[in-house]
């Protein structure tokens, strides 16, 4: 099930077939539709639509095209509309310097006033931005980020990576519409690659911006599936991954839908199955959300208790249908080495491929060289190097005090031993960490240690 986070089904383009369009959306797997107001009248119509369909929600706000008509009465009406229980956001509001249907000074003035009203009412905002990057960022930075609260959604994102990163830093989600499917939208697709899963949405902006392959026709919520499929392709995940992550994001922003339930033991991303054995770890990496938000691609990896080997094995269906089975959660799998070995043995006997994701502390944790014990059980190992020297490693990965001032060297020793017993060995780092020379890390992996190297972008978990 997918969510269309931005549509305008109240518009006259749907006057003749609105019910059938909404029915087609449901039949195509659309779980919720957020119908977005553009002025007071359309906001009122959005509410009326939400009252007829339990899966349709509404927003209220005035689009930058229409702010030239705003007065005190309009603000009073908006305030009243926001008392309705199905109005879950304020918008769409913002700046549009492409068409300039309203004078820019009025756009800026009413954007600020609507932001202030949204904050007073405690509502997230739906942001419209077109060709107004500098003023947009200048205005938003006066109000966001909020302490402990998300800001809202940059809808139908069309900006560059810098705008996306600065919007993310202020607490906004980024939503992609039909243009991400357009033939010449390579820059936009590059941005779609780097949005963290927990800040991602997809939308239609119906009736506008119909995605390929239906471009040129009137848009409708069912087409959000095309956009979601393209975003999944761009990000190297499945459409199910996009559906799951955006559904959780919708719940976390608006409280609509379902929370991700804790206790996940096995979880599928792309065509790999991951096994979550523990939340304990010998590191407390500065970039890790193990304690604050143990969620990966919409799965909640918080464990009520550590699963037994039997429970782990029983959580797996058919090992042969996956590209690989990966021991990887937010904790360090080698803290439960016996479980790793017992389950890996069964996976191999059933014809599966096994990969171990580890911080490379396994020999120190278990006080022996564990690599010979993994021979024949583990086909591939990914080891988190994360730094180009011991001092940087201790600052970024924050190992247990007893492991500092030397664990980095032990990780290199672990890698050298892994090469003797495991067919595929890879070193990984998380990018954008202060004080880390990423080029030097690649040299250490390739030239010094003679293994493959992979850099994972900060905040791109899973």
Label each PLM-derived region with a short phrase.
Residues 1-254, 272, 287-294, 300-313:
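Mid-domain alpha/beta scaffold segments of enzyme catalytic cores
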Residues 30, 87, 122-123, 197, ...:
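A structural motif
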Residues 34, 57, 126, 153-155, ...:
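A structural signal for isolated positions on well-ordered beta-strands in alpha/beta enzyme cores
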Residues 245-266, 450-462:
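Short, basic/aromatic-enriched C-terminal tail that caps enzymatic domains
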Residues 260-291:
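N-terminal pre-triad scaffold of radical SAM enzymes
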Residues 308-330:
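Short Fe-S-cluster ligation motifs
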Residues 330-462:
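Conserved AdoMet/S-adenosylmethionine-binding subsite of the radical SAM
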């Amino acid at each position: 099930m997918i969510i269309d986070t931005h549509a305008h089904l109240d518009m006259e383009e749907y006057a003749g077939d609105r019910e059938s369009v909404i029915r087609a959306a449901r039949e195509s797997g659309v779980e919720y539709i957020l119908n977005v107001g553009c002025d007071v009248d359309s906001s009122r119509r959005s509410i009326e639509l939400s009252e007829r369909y339990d899966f349709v929600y509404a927003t209220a706000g005035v689009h930058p095209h229409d702010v030239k008509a705003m007065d005190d009465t309009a603000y009073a009406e908006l305030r009243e509309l926001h008392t309705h229980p199905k109005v879950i956001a304020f918008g769409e509001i913002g700046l549009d310097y492409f068409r300039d249907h309203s004078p820019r000074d009025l756009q800026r003035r009413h954007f600020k006033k609507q932001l202030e009203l949204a904050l007073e009412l405690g509502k997230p905002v739906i942001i419209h931005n077109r060709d107004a990057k500098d003023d947009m960022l200048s205005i938003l930075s006066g109000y966001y980020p909020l302490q402990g609260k998300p800001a809202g959604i940059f809808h139908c994102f069309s900006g560059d990576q810098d705008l996306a990163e600065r919007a993310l830093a202020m607490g906004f989600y980024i939503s992609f519409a039909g243009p991400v499917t357009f033939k010449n939208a390579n820059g936009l697709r590059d941005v779609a690659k780097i949005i963290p899963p927990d800040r991602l949405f997809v939308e239609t902006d119906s009736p506008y911006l119909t995605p390929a392959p239906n471009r040129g026709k009137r848009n409708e919520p069912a087409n959000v599936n095309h956009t979601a499929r393209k975003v999944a392709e761009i990000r190297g995940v499945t459409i199910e991954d996009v559906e799951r992550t955006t559904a959780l994001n919708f719940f976390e922003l608006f409280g609509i839908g379902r929370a991700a339930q804790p206790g996940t033991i096995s979880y599928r991303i792309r065509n790999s199955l991951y096994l979550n054995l523990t939340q304990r770890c010998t590191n407390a990496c500065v970039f890790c959300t193990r304690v604050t938000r143990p969620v990966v691609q919409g799965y909640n990896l918080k464990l009520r208790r550590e699963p037994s080997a039997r429970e782990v094995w029983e959580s797996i269906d058919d090992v042969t249908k996956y590209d690989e089975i990966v021991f990887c959660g937010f904790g360090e799998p080698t803290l439960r080495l016996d479980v790793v070995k017992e389950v890996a043995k069964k996976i191999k006997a059933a014809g599966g491929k096994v990969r171990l994701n580890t911080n490379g502390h396994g020999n120190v944790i278990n006080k022996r060289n564990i690599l010979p014990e993994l021979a024949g059980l583990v086909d591939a190992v990914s080891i988190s190097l994360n730094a180009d020297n011991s001092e940087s490693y201790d600052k970024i990965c924050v190992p247990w005090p007893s492991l500092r001032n030397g664990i980095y060297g032990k990780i290199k020793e672990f890698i050298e031993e892994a090469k003797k017993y495991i067919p595929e060995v890879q070193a990984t780092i998380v990018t954008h960490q202060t004080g880390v020379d990423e080029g030097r890390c690649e040299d250490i992996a390739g030239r010094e240690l003679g293994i493959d190297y992979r850099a994972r972008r900060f905040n791109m978990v899973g």
